[in-house]
């Protein structure tokens, strides 16, 4: 079992139940999935850029990403309907907790000039979205082997009903907010 999952089941559930004054154990907020998305805008002109993004995402997430396609043609962005423009991975279960553990304990401390994530990035239903400017903060990525620095979006979906519940859950996991 993942270290963070065991910690959640052993310590954090009881702490959250007391903090949020929840009576039913099934109402305690938990993380359901983590979605990683890497948009590669230049993939419309150079298809090899997408291969590098897919390889990086596979190293970071530990599973093969799905290539995302453009939903409609936009002349201003020079993309057509159905063209590959990025990749995404959805993590659940033990892989999700392993990734979250690596993100909190290894990757976030390696971000340059980091002063904490914004606590305003919740969507109103307890889900948190954030962006990373470079993929090299993850130890799986070898700096010498990457073709270019890419950013990514990370969305953490929870069962929390409000932003305050989601914020309490993320803080309990040790997420650094401003």
Curated annotation (Swiss-Prot):
Any one biological process term the GO annotation gives: translation
Cellular component annotations (GO), alphabetically ordered: ribonucleoprotein complex; ribosome
InterPro entries with a match to the protein in the record: Ribosomal_uL5 (IPR002132), Ribosomal_uL5_bac-type (IPR020930), Ribosomal_uL5_C (IPR031309), Ribosomal_uL5_CS (IPR020929), Ribosomal_uL5_dom_sf (IPR022803), Ribosomal_uL5_N (IPR031310)
Keyword field contains Cell membrane: no
Record-annotated membrane-spanning stretches: none
Family matches, as PROSITE patterns: RIBOSOMAL_L5
GO molecular function: rRNA binding; structural constituent of ribosome; tRNA binding
Superkingdom of origin organism: Bacteria
Keywords, sorted A to Z: Ribonucleoprotein, Ribosomal protein, RNA-binding, rRNA-binding, tRNA-binding
PANTHER family: 60S RIBOSOMAL PROTEIN L11-RELATED
Family: Belongs to the universal ribosomal protein uL5 family.
HAMAP family assigned: Ribosomal_uL5_B
Subunit structure: Part of the 50S ribosomal subunit; part of the 5S rRNA/L5/L18/L25 subcomplex. Contacts the 5S rRNA and the P site tRNA. Forms a bridge to the 30S subunit in the 70S ribosome.
Function summary: This is one of the proteins that bind and probably mediate the attachment of the 5S RNA into the large ribosomal subunit, where it forms part of the central protuberance. In the 70S ribosome it contacts protein S13 of the 30S subunit (bridge B1b), connecting the 2 subunits; this bridge is implicated in subunit movement. Contacts the P site tRNA; the 5S rRNA and some of its associated proteins might help stabilize positioning of ribosome-bound tRNAs.
Protein name: Large ribosomal subunit protein uL5
